[in-house]
């Protein structure tokens, strides 16, 4: 039960971070492309690579904390559902190129960020 509380608390924190970070990104870059969603997903992809690799190589992050961070915080921070909805809206609006770029950049860049997070954790 205690683990669920930690996951819920960090999940709420992740959601708030997503709200504020994506809002800030949209203020800076505008809304012609899903920049805010891409930004939070890139950050989350880097962090999950870092946290998971570091926790596998070290006992510094106990499983309870690892679950709270990955399932809770990063689950709240990142959003596949918003990515899907925004991409669908782009397709629906006839912005096929922007939708394609969003999918391509999101997948390739998120995988790259995860890899970078893993490499950083291995270097620590």
UniProtKB/Swiss-Prot annotation:
The chain crosses the membrane at residues 5-25, 32-52, 67-87, 96-116. Keywords: Cell inner membrane, Cell membrane, Ion channel, Ion transport, Membrane, Metal-binding, Sodium, Transmembrane, Transmembrane helix, Transport. Na(+) is not transported, but it plays an essential structural role and its presence is essential for fluoride channel function. It comes from the Bacteria. It is found in: Cell inner membrane. Na(+) binds at residues 75, 78. One of its GO terms (biological process) is cellular detoxification of fluoride. The keyword Oxidoreductase does not apply. Belongs to the fluoride channel Fluc/FEX (TC 1.A.43) family. Fluoride-specific ion channel. Important for reducing fluoride concentration in the cell, thus reducing its toxicity. This is Fluoride-specific ion channel FluC.
